[in-house]
Each structure stands twice: as C-alpha cells, then as structure tokens.
Amino acid sequence: MDNEAALSHLVGARISAGRAALALSLDQLATRTGVSRAMISRIERGEVHASAVVLDKICAGLGIALSNLFARAAESPLLRRADQPVWRDPQSSYLRREVAPTGTGSAVHIVEVEFPAGAEVTLGPAEHRVIEQHVWLLEGQMQITLGPTIHTLNLGDCLHMHPDRAGITFRNPGALPARYAVILTLKAS
C-alpha cells in the first residue's frame, strides 16, 4: 500500500472512530456536515481521497481539527522528515505535511504547506476545534481572507488569527508555488 492509500485508510478510520465516539449514524453525520452519506461511507472505507473542503466539513461535524485526521501515535518526540505524514488535496493539489510529532499531548500542531500558483481553498470556521492559528510564509506570496478582511503575505510575514470566527480562504495569487508553516493551538478534546 502506498503512502497516499495508507493515509486515506488512516483518515477513514479516524472519521469512523470519531463518529462512533459521538454515537452518530452516517445519516446524522451527513446532516451535520452537508456531506453525503455515501461519500462519508466511502471515505471511512478508504476508497476515496477526499478534498480538504470535504474533510474540513466532516471535522466540523465531529468537532475536531483537520490535523487530528493525520495524527499518528507518538513513538518518539522526534519525527523525522521521511516519517512525516504527507497528504495532497485532490482538488487544489496543495501538499500538507504534518511536521510536529503528534500524540505527545501537546496542544500545538505544526503543518508545512506547499500551495500551487493560482490555487485557492476555502475552509469553514474551525468553531470549537482550534483556539488560534499562525501562518508564517516561507516562500512565495499568499492571500488569506478571514471574514471580510484580505491579508496579503509576503516572504517572512506571519499572520495570527482565530479561525473559529469566520471561514478562511487561502489563495496563491503569484506565478510560483508558495510554502508556509501553519502553527495551530488546538482545544483539548
């Protein structure tokens, strides 16, 4: 099984476990999220590589952060680059790498994102999942829309936000890919 298939199965298992923990049927989760029952079922079985937008809706319905879907049990406080979970959004082709070891009890998650030129992704409010988030631009240019405000980030800029208050749109207006770090502080489950 390749990394993408393994990660799809991990994501599916996490969604299924989250749904079971809340004693939700597929129909109930579909109603909460606006994602079809059939799509949720296919994701849970690892048959579909869902987009960030779809996974974000499911996470909102489960009350968890997107990072929780990719987290692995901590085996060490050191997570080598070769072992970091990597996921590619099938819609926008952005690449998401979980940089920090998960399962350590830390409320902080660090994600590296490679965002293609011209790509755009809109995620809903993080509601009760994320307390705060920083986006630190390492390469390229990004526009981040939070509510009615558009923030243009250039090399080295860092944006602090509370994503529970409004949806977020990530857009790369440049001709080159952008790379940035996202530092999330998650609420305790």
Q: Predicted segments — roles?
A:
Residues 35-48:
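Recognition helix of helix-turn-helix/homeodomain-like DNA-binding domains
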Residues 52-107:
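A short, N-terminal "cap"/entry segment at the start of jelly-roll beta-barrel domains
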